[in-house]
Amino acid sequence: MPLIDLPGFAGDLLADFERRNTLRVDTPVIQPAEPFLDMAGEDLRRRIFMTESETGESLCLRPEFTIPVCLRHIETATGTPQRYAYLGEVFRQRRDGSSEFYQAGIEDLGDPDTAAADARVVGDALFVLSNRLPGERLKVTLGDQSVFEAVIAACGLPGGWQKRLIHAFGDQKQLDRLLAELADPKSPGVFGHDVERVAALGMLDDEERLVAHIGETMEATGYSTNASRSPRDIARRLKEKVELAATRLDKEALAVMRAFLALDLPLADAPAALHSFAGKARLRIDDALELFDARVAALALAGADPGPMRYRAAFGRPLDYYTGLVFEIHVEGTPAVLAGGGRFDRLLTLLGAREHIPAVGFSLWLDRIEQAAGREK
């Protein structure tokens, strides 16, 4: 039995979900831990309550609903498009508030019209929040990971650096640190004598020699390749580490990256600003901007008020599975996030779906909504 009570508005919230043409689903509280550890991001991973089955399987208390709902969709072989709604407890170590709390939300799976589906879920979130908080001014912050990825690719960064920057998207301190590293790369020697020695021997440019050298060293020091990474895996990681550290981004490209990340303006003005930025920087990011433009147009077509919406180029959310739109909603003048979500087009494939399933959704923090409703009275 839950240790906390459902908010009094839970029934009305579920009725709102039904009006939005969703199918309510539930998922087990005890979940396999691996999907969350692999795909949920560092911020969520360190907050998960872990346990273990009698057979040694790593399990956890459900820390969120998106991954369980997607797994359920795959397991039941349900066709798409499909819109799921959920409401239930999640368990997460938090700095403020209880570690057991209620979340609700919608996962919109399988609609090939990306812009329309993105606009629909933002509209869904605003609809249910407006009904719970009729006297409050809601503010929406939007970002777009696909535009960010297009910009860093157009700047000519190596694939390894692109992965690091994408992983840091939404964490301004981490992005600043990585950009500082790109402005001042390290020499191979900073990684220690072993790396300096193989660099001096020219092995970093000859993978087979490097693999053989690592294998001989492992054998001589008693390391088992069965109990650790293979010599080839270690060689590839070593070369990537040195290559990343030695990469320098020229001043012009760094200025372009920083100019992009500084964009922060009303959503209605964002398409023109992004096209102007891309033109001045001579970046070929047409596909990403075309989708961005289509989403803004779809929001207008759906009747969404652009006034409360703001685009921040550096805005992301601390979950690794997002691929495009990301957004959060809060009451004007307060920091508490009431709703957050985005697009996660790769997630279902990574979880085992046999075909590509585009997906977008959002979650609501019911305890925070209840607190906001209490302030309103």
UniProtKB/Swiss-Prot annotation:
It is found in: Cytoplasm. Gene3D superfamilies: Bira Bifunctional Protein, Domain 2. The keyword Coiled coil does not apply. InterPro entries: aa-tRNA-synth_II/BPL/LPL (IPR045864), HisRS-like_core (IPR041715), HisRS/HisZ (IPR004516), HisZ (IPR004517). Keywords: Amino-acid biosynthesis, Cytoplasm, Histidine biosynthesis. Pathway: Amino-acid biosynthesis; L-histidine biosynthesis; L-histidine from 5-phospho-alpha-D-ribose 1-diphosphate: step 1/9. Its main location: cytoplasm. One of its GO terms (molecular function) is histidine-tRNA ligase activity. GO terms for biological process: histidyl-tRNA aminoacylation; L-histidine biosynthetic process. GO terms for cellular component: cytoplasm. The keyword Amino-acid biosynthesis applies. Required for the first step of histidine biosynthesis. May allow the feedback regulation of ATP phosphoribosyltransferase activity by histidine. Belongs to the class-II aminoacyl-tRNA synthetase family. HisZ subfamily. This function is generally fulfilled by the C-terminal part of HisG, which is missing in some bacteria such as this one. Heteromultimer composed of HisG and HisZ subunits. This is ATP phosphoribosyltransferase regulatory subunit. It comes from Sinorhizobium medicae (strain WSM419).
